[in-house]
Structures are given as structure tokens and as C-alpha cells.
């Protein structure tokens, strides 16, 4: 019995390497800086309307709603990281009034390829004129909110990312766009 205890296998727990890459938090941007859009309207850096978290990106306006148009971000991942290492994308989102809270749902675009995350901004956790902080979109699950990243995109280290509410009349704020990675330990 004593010898059996000596030759028992040692279980080494799996400890994945986890981390995050901040895509955009807008704090280093000048007020009024414009980001490109996938279609019409505009995306401009403004102060957080609640005055609590510095700067945020205002997508659409009262007079020029974002109609199925989303802000675009040029992403260059840190050295050694590729898109397939990332398990999710988190965003802070604040819908103005109810502009785009329902619509056709939340969307993510990678190099122009559209992914439907399976829910609209309301079911994603947004309420009018209130921040929904740290909302998670999975990059490796078809369960909403999420999608399966295609194999051919997993090796990307630079790409164009767009994210937002697909609606004929959207207006919202985005902040703290962050991607989280997880690698085998």
C-alpha cells in the first residue's frame, strides 16, 4: 500500500494563460475625432453623457441615425497573438433613448464579414440612456450572444473590426472595446 502511494500519478492542473487586449477606450482620442463607418452617419468621440467614464464614441445623431452602419476600428494585435487566441469581445454600450435598441440585432464585422450575435441590444442587456458595461460577445460559441469565428480568420493579426446595433435608426455610445484571450497553459 505504501509503494502504491509513492507511484500515484501527480495531477498537474490545466492553467490557461489569460489576458486582454484593449482595442479602443477613446481616452487618448481628441474630442471630436471621427471614426469611419461601414455605411452612413457618423461616429465621433465625445464625453461620456453621464460624466463618469471619460470619453466614449457617439454613433449616429438625433438628425442622422446610423442605418445598418457601424463604427470601424483598425486592429493590430500584440506580437505573438492571433485572432484565434481570443475567446470573447466585451463592450460598454449606451443606447440613446430607444434608437436601435431592437432592430435586426447586434452585429460584429471582421474584415467586412458580418456576424449576427443572436440578440438585439435590449436582450444584450441595454436599456435606454443607461450604460450596459462589460457586455460579452463570444467568439467561439453559437450560443447568443456570440458566433463561431471561421477557421480562415483565426490566423489574423491585423484586421478591421466593426461592432454595433443593426437598425434603421440607431444611435448609441460605445466604450471600452476589449478582446480577451485564453491560451493552453
Specify the residue positions occupied by each region the protein language model found:
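Extracellular carbohydrate recognition
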Residues: 152-155, 164-180
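Short carbohydrate-recognition loop motifs
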Residues: 44-69
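Beta-strand acidic-aromatic groove motif in beta-rich domains, primarily in extracellular
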Residues: 69-71, 97-112
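Extracellular carbohydrate recognition and processing domains
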Residues: 113-153
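Solvent-exposed strand-to-loop "edge" motifs in beta-rich extracellular domains
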Residues: 28, 90-99
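Extended extracellular/luminal ectodomain segments enriched in beta-structured repeat modules
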Residues: 80-90, 101, 156
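Extracellular carbohydrate-recognition regions
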Residues: 5-40, 185
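Short beta-strands within extracellular/lumenal beta-sheet-rich domains
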Residues: 63-84
